[in-house]
Amino acid sequence: MTLIKSISGIRGTIGGGAGEGLNPLDIVKFTSTYATLIRKTCKSTSNKIVVGRDARISGEMVKNVVVGTLMGMGWDVVDIDLASTPTTELAVTMEGACGGIILTASHNPKQWNALKLLNEHGEFLNAAEGNEVLRIAEAEEFDYADVDHLGSYRKDLTYNTKHIDSVLALDLVDVDAIKKADFRVAIDCVNSVGGIILPELLERLGVKHVEKLYCEPTGNFAHNPEPLEKNLGDIMNLMKGGKADVAFVVDPDVDRLAMICENGVMYGEEYTLVTVADYVLKHTPGNTVSNLSSTRALRDVTRKYGMEYNASAVGEVNVVTKMKATNAVIGGEGNGGVIYPASHYGRDALVGIALFLSHLAHEGKKVSELRATYPPYFIAKNRVDLTPEIDVDAILAKVKEIYKNEEINDIDGVKIDFADKWVHLRKSNTEPIIRVYSEASTMEAAEEIGQKIMDVINDLAKK
């Protein structure tokens, strides 16, 4: 059993004793903690909290515990049940609620679940709020309601449709062009909530030909749910058979979007955001943001339009903070996460699909041809395992000193920008390791510079 408590929420494997896994005792504790925090921080007069969940097998159990606890804390619960992460985020603002809890472990296997915590803006808690959650949980500073002040319960299953309504209302979503293009689309929804909302989205976008793979929301994931090439053999083979113009693949909570070209070749998750940004910038010039570990291609595309690109620390809340500070019109993360402020400040695969199909319809190209129009970069992802007694921060400081003549960014680990490549070093918050991401114009060059930096780290660790 595993239970991980962090500033972004609580996640773990289902079962075990108190503090060992994600079980009812720990769910009650952290729901109570969140309810206590939101009571202090919410500026609204609302007494509502929204609860949504992906299709995990444990979801119904976890939801029932969360809902009962919130009512016991005096909160009025709006249960939107099976819903994507972006749907739940939008529901918070549409309801005028004080916050929301999303029950999803994102791309983790079916034995995992988690509580992801939202503020009154439908955005994830910041670091200070996350730390306060951990403090309240440790101190067990809870105050439950008396019998006359218990919260109420309301189920509302309209938010999937409301989410789609909001996507279709976006100025840059060109439904007429998509209908005219008569696309054939394949989808893999890994037997979670994407299987509910993606077919409805595509139908309302005017896509008449949809090949559905793993669209039953049973929570029995048909493959590893992270939308990476090594896990997507079935839909890649379907595409090689010439059955569709493009394939969309989402993770269990539908905040990440991967795509597959008409020839069965992966589009590249780093290029989901790059492509959508190209379309957005063409029509609404402005700044862009992605995290330090994302492809340089977004910077290149942004500069093509004479706009400014900025990098944030890794993590959605950090990307959103930087986007607000720089008035970015589009941003996100290189794992297929598209954040479009005209919709809301959260990664949203539905927005990504609608904008991508609009762009594809306007360009009149095959998906593989569109992909070829963007700068070719390759990212290598590695790690250096260290012993617990080694001072990781000291090693990162020494690496920074060694490469002081290069462009350095140290807002999140150390990123070294060379003229034609980069390397990003980040320490793990939970393990004695350093993650090493490197990018260059060929995979060989990316691996080479990554290995060079890893050799430096290993040499420093021996001293």
Describe each model-derived feature in a short phrase.
Residues 51-54, 187-189, 261, 342, ...:
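Short glycine-centered, acidic/aromatic-flanked micro-motifs in structured strand/loop junctions
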Residues 244, 284-463:
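Phosphate-binding and adjacent anionic-ligand microenvironments
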Residues 36, 48-112, 200-260:
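N-terminal small/polar loop signature for handling phosphorylated ligands or for N-terminal nucleophile
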Residues 1-68, 72-73, 152-184:
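An N-terminal, well-structured beta->alpha segment
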Residues 117-120, 258-262, 339-341:
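Short beta-strand-to-turn element immediately C-terminal to the catalytic PLP-Schiff-base lysine
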Residues 13, 113-240:
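Gly/Ser/Thr-enriched, mixed-charge loops and adjacent short helices
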